[in-house]
């Protein structure tokens, strides 16, 4: 994101729309920054927020819903409450990237994820059915 912003600012400077100034945020760490990252940990994507995500629900909610892709009830809850995920696609594509890692497995766990989402969002079975219908339409584009 910084590179995109830098390029945009430099373009504006080059056409005399902005005056050149020293960058004020060059050393600013991104939200969730962590100095030492354990890349093998599937929770590494949360950086310094990892422990908050893990403790967001109960300790039993840190067990993955799948053996193939990593997604927990705590991640689902965190994504809804702190990242404004509202649809099954939001969770399985945008927040966890599960759909890109294993589309078939994402399809298999989608009902569990939708049920947990409905519980958190206080939605009914009709909402779950609609989300699953939309997701099953989408997933066809990812399963080879």
Task: Identify the meaning behind each predicted range.
Residues 1-144:
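C-terminal accessory subdomains/tails of enzymes that are appended
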């Amino acid at each position: 994101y910084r590179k995109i912003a830098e390029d945009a600012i430099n373009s504006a400077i080059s056409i005399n729309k902005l005056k050149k100034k020293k960058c004020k945020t060059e050393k600013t760490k991104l939200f969730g920054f962590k100095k030492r990252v354990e890349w093998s940990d599937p929770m590494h994507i949360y950086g310094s927020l990892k422990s908050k995500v893990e403790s967001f629900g109960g300790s039993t909610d840190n067990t993955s819903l799948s053996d193939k892709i990593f997604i927990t009830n705590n991640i689902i809850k965190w994504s809804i409450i702190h990242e404004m995920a509202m649809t099954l696609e939001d969770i399985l594509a945008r927040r966890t990237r599960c759909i890109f890692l294993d589309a078939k497995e994402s399809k298999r766990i989608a009902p569990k994820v939708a049920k947990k989402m409905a519980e958190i969002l206080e939605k009914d079975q009709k909402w779950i059915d609609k989300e699953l219908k939309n997701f099953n339409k989408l997933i066809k584009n990812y399963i080879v």
